[in-house]
UniProtKB/Swiss-Prot annotation:
InterPro entries (alphabetical): DCDC2_DCX_dom2, Doublecortin_dom, Doublecortin_dom_sf
Tissue spec: Expressed in hair cells of the inner ear.
Gene Ontology cellular-component annotations: axoneme; cilium; cytoplasm; kinocilium; synapse
Superkingdom of the source species: Eukaryota
Keyword entries, A-Z: Cell projection, Cilium biogenesis/degradation, Cytoplasm, Cytoskeleton, Neurogenesis, Phosphoprotein, Repeat
The protein's name in its UniProt record: Doublecortin domain-containing protein 2
UniProt organism field: Mus musculus (Mouse)
Length: 475
């Protein structure tokens, strides 16, 4: 009974197929494995739906299935074989490609290894050594502008390949050096020899760049410099002058040292430790003597004994040839320093003291009248008309300003004098007004305001008036 039942179970198992599907016309898609289950994939349309989700083609849903080699179209699910390769396509036609080789890594065939070992044969072929071969290094040249002796030479690196193209070399030189005439057309050596090709250029040499103008023969060799002299150690000054040969100190070096030692001994009264006598003293004195002798020799050689001095030019300059020396004359003016000029005597003026006294009196008078001018400013505006009629009255009014400037006692005495002086003037004023009343009334306008009256009061009267006002206000 167990036998037939087991056979029926084997026959009832579902059929499962596995296929590899490629994209139509895609040479880079390596294929996608799709499993066809009998229960899940019951029809061909369901299979197309499964392939659409697995392949994810850019053309959209899969509508046709083709064989990879011949492009035969499959229309039923029964035609698909397990383990086969197929191409999924849309509504477009089949595109023939080598789909089966997509994604496979091609292995290179192994080369046949020669197992036989040949013996070494010593040959007599002459081959140049490798270290003797010239390397392809760039050519370095130094360029100088035509007729320019001021600016230093410019360094230019020319590649080895560019030396064959002479126009390209001239273009590089033009970019490096700017000439007034424009581009660089020719290169010359310092001696004036024309360079016509890049093969004539030598590494590390100096050349003159010339434009449209002619080559100027100048001492370009003065621009050549020693690189070792240009380099200086770290911390040294850039513009360091050479030591002076034959200075004044070198002549009297011995006397200078002796005087310095005597001055130091006189200034410093403290006792100094005694030096030990022996070999050290003799050794220390020898090099100093040698240095002094060397300095004296150099100083005698440097300074000539002509009596003309070191500031006298040895040879005549080309610029001063033919120039005549101008002799001094009576009309020539010579500037003399201030210390050497004769002293000039200035006579004092007789009126100097008088003018100084008048100035001092005016200053004192203006200081005393400073306060009165502010107070009497308003009153002066009203009394200007009266001062026009009587000129002498204005001079006499200056006395009250002095009265206000002093103390109370002085003001009291001066006020009495002022009152006595003003009485005859008031009488004269009344007479003049009586005589000229008819003429003044006829000449004046009816709308003219009356003249203000000026009264002079002492400080004591002012205090009494203020006290009376205060008492009346209290009452």
């Amino acid at each position: 009974m167990n036998g037939p039942s087991s056979r029926s179970s084997h026959l009832s198992q579902p059929v499962v197929k596995s296929v590899l599907v490629y994209r139509n016309g895609d040479p880079f898609f390596a294929g996608r494995r799709v499993v066809i289950h009998e229960k899940k994939v019951s029809s061909f349309d369901v299979f197309l739906k499964e392939v659409t989700g697995g392949v994810q083609a850019p053309f959209g849903a899969v509508r046709n299935i083709y064989t990879p080699r011949t492009g035969h179209r499959i229309r039923k699910l029964d035609q698909i074989e397990s383990g086969g390769n197929y191409v999924a396509g849309g509504p477009e036609a089949f595109k023939k490609l080598n789909y089966l080789d997509i994604g496979e890594i091609k292995k290179r065939p192994m080369e046949a290894v020669n197992t036989e070992v040949k013996p070494v044969i010593h040959s007599r072929i002459n081959v140049s050594a490798r270290f003797r071969k010239s390397l392809h290094e760039p050519c370095t040249i130094f360029l100088i502008a035509n007729g320019d002796l001021i600016s230093p030479a410019s360094r230019l690196l020319i590649p080895k390949k560019a030396l064959n193209q002479w126009d390209h070399v001239l273009q590089m030189v033009t970019e490096k050096i700017t000439l007034r005439s424009g581009a660089v057309h020719r290169l010359y050596t310092l001696e004036g020899k024309l360079v016509e090709s890049g093969a004539e250029l030598e590494n590390g040499q100096f050349y003159v760049a010339v434009g449209r103008d002619k080559f100027k023969r100048l001492p370009y060799s003065e621009l050549l410099f020693d690189k070792s002299a240009m380099r200086r150690p770290y911390g040294q000054k850039a513009s360091s002058l050479p030591p002076m040969v034959g200075s004044r100190k070198s002549k009297g070096s011995g006397n200078y040292r002796q005087s310095k030692s005597t001055i130091g001994s006189s200034d410093n009264s403290s006792p100094q430790p005694l030096k030990r006598k022996g070999k050290k003293d003799s050794n220390s004195e020898k090099p100093t003597k040698v240095k002094q002798s060397v300095k004296s020799k150099t100083s005698h050689q440097a300074i000539p004994d002509n009596g003309e001095g070191i500031f006298k030019a040895g040879a005549e300059r080309s610029e001063t040839r033919g120039a005549a020396e101008v002799q001094e004359d009576e009309d020539t003016q010579v500037e003399v320093p201030v210390d050497q000029r004769p002293a000039e005597i200035v006579d004092e003026e007789e009126d100097g003291e008088k003018t100084s006294k008048d100035a001092n009196q005016k200053e004192d008078f203006s200081a005393m009248n400073g306060e009165t001018e502010d107070r009497g400013g308003s009153k002066a505006a009203g009394t200007s008309e009266q001062e026009e009629g009587i000129p002498d009255h204005g001079e006499k009014k200056s006395s009250p300003s002095r009265v206000n400037g002093g103390t109370d006692e002085e003001n009291g005495e001066e006020l009495d004098q002022v009152a006595e002086e003003l009485q005859p003037t008031e009488d004269e004023k009344g007479k003049a007004e009586g005589d000229n009343s008819g003429q003044d009334e006829a000449g004046l306008d009816a709308q003219r305001p009356p003249r203000p009256e000026v009264t002079v009061t002492s400080p004591q009267e002012n205090e009494e008036n203020e006290a009376n006002k205060a008492s009346s206000a209290v009452a």
